[in-house]
Amino acid sequence: MALIRKTFYFLFAVFFVLVQLPSECQAGLDFSQPFPSDEFAVCESCKLGRGKCRKECLENEKPDGNCRLNFLCCRERI
């Protein structure tokens, strides 16, 4: 009986650890690395690829929403 209880606790602990691991869906654009030119990959909230996520927009760009914390979606001025 004690062996069954220990096995149950072991499997429960393994399950708990596996649940804490991040899922594959979190490994997307939100965690992308910056490019050498200090630009980030295009965010989903950045109008379907028509802008770039940056801390500050360039002179020829205008802010058009937020990508994530402290980043703006910058689009070219028309």
From Swiss-Prot:
GO terms in the biological process aspect are: defense response to bacterium; innate immune response
* Entry annotated with the keyword S-adenosyl-L-methionine: no
Keywords (alphabetical) are:
Antibiotic, Antimicrobial, Defensin, Disulfide bond, Secreted, Signal
Q: Does the keyword Signal apply?
A: yes
Q: Which InterPro entries match?
A: Beta_defensin_dom
Q: Subcellular location, in the record's words?
A: Secreted
Which domain of life does this protein belong to? Eukaryota
Which Pfam families does the protein's record reference? Defensin_beta_2
| Signal peptide range | 1-27
Q: Which GO terms describe its cellular component?
A: extracellular region
Disulfide pairs here are C43-C74, C53-C67, C57-C73
User: Any idea what job this protein has?
Assistant: Has antimicrobial activity.
The record's similarity note reads: Belongs to the beta-defensin family.
Protein name from the UniProt record: Beta-defensin 105A
Which organism does this sequence originate in? Pongo pygmaeus (Bornean orangutan)
Q: Which gene encodes it?
A: DEFB105A
